[in-house]
Amino acid sequence: MNKKLFTQIKNEWRSNLWLITELLLVSVVLWYIVDYMYVQTSIYNEPRGFDISHCYLVQMGRLTDKSADFIPNQTDEEKRQDVKELLSRLQHRPDIEAAGLGQNSYPYNGSNSSASVVYDTLRSPGWTIRRLVSPDFVRVFRYRGTRGETPEQLAEMLKHPKNFLASDNLYKRRYGCDLTSLVDKQFYLFGDTTNTYNLAASLQVVRYGDYFEAWNSYCMVAPMPEEWYDLGTELCVRVKEDQDRDFIARLKADSEKLYRVGNVFIADVRSFTDIRRNFQQSHTNAWNSYLFGMGFLLLNIFLGLLGTFWFRTQQRRGEIALMKSLGGTDHSIFVRQLAEGLILLAVATIPAIFIDWNLANSELNAWMNGTTIE
């Protein structure tokens, strides 16, 4: 049977050549689709390096001179103390686990600042995110160190003004060096070569967002001077796990009585679940469009192949009837047809693998971890 099957395939080489070409194109397209979907899914599921569950952004406002409660002629120091006092009151609220201030620091934030982190001849990438924060900020989003440091331990480290934290992958791409090996070393920050800062801990990589790769996400975290405490900073809180229900409504209800400090008041409260959704809406829409488009393409490929083999079978009805008259069973005929299709697919797969490899080698497919071949 095998010999007859190969002879038949050879004799029908013209029609089989078209079928092999179709299978070749389908194989290449399917590989490209599967590769893209795998890469995007893998990136989305990478560890984020932070946790926004039970977290809220508290937006501050300041009374104007049109308000009867406005306090005029406040000094800059008094304004800073008002913000500091509001932070302290929130930290002591029973349903809040942690509260902290940051500048361009919270997750899913479109506003960024960058900083240089230099050790000897090692220099951080130009897009290293600078996060200036109060110590408890890392407790709010549960940052963790690569050597097992807890958020509480990291917060203690940030109480020293000369300590800082940074992503473990900061020098990995350029120099192949993990930052863990440089903990407790002295660094230059912010382009200042007259002062040194101590790397207190190396952080598990903090990603910029769910659709951004971990390997390309860099950040450094340093204590924010109290002189910078003002309305432009971001006040973030984490509530206890059983206190999420109606937290925003409860906090707003208490805000006028308990959280009006000087001219500073709570203007709005937003859940980080909403912030995350809004920040990533365009990425999510693009991802859904890709899913729909690729699903539609896969359906067309499936129907096209099904139609091709159905049409091929219809053309060979006479041949199938002859095989049955010569003693062939439905099972044996089905196995023969299936074997022929698998042989043609195997023939098409060989050049398809070659094409796929060259596409990847030419960096024309999806990237992950800085490469198209992993």
Regions found by a protein language model. Give the residues of each.
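Hydrophobic secondary-structure segments that place a key small or acidic residue at a functional site
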Residues: 123-217
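Membrane-proximal extracellular/periplasmic loop immediately following the first transmembrane helix
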Residues: 34-125
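Generic structural signal for small/hydrophobic residues in well-ordered secondary structure
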Residues: 40, 58, 90, 96-99, ...
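Short juxtamembrane loops and helix-capping segments at transmembrane helix boundaries
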Residues: 43-50, 355-374
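"Rare, low-scoring activations can occur
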Residues: 161-162, 168-169, 192-287
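A short amphipathic helical element positioned immediately N-terminal to and/or at the very start
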Residues: 1-12, 86
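Hydrophobic alpha-helical transmembrane segments of multi-pass inner-membrane transport and secretion
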Residues: 13-39, 282-318, 345-352
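Transmembrane alpha-helical interface segments in multi-pass membrane proteins
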Residues: 297, 318-364
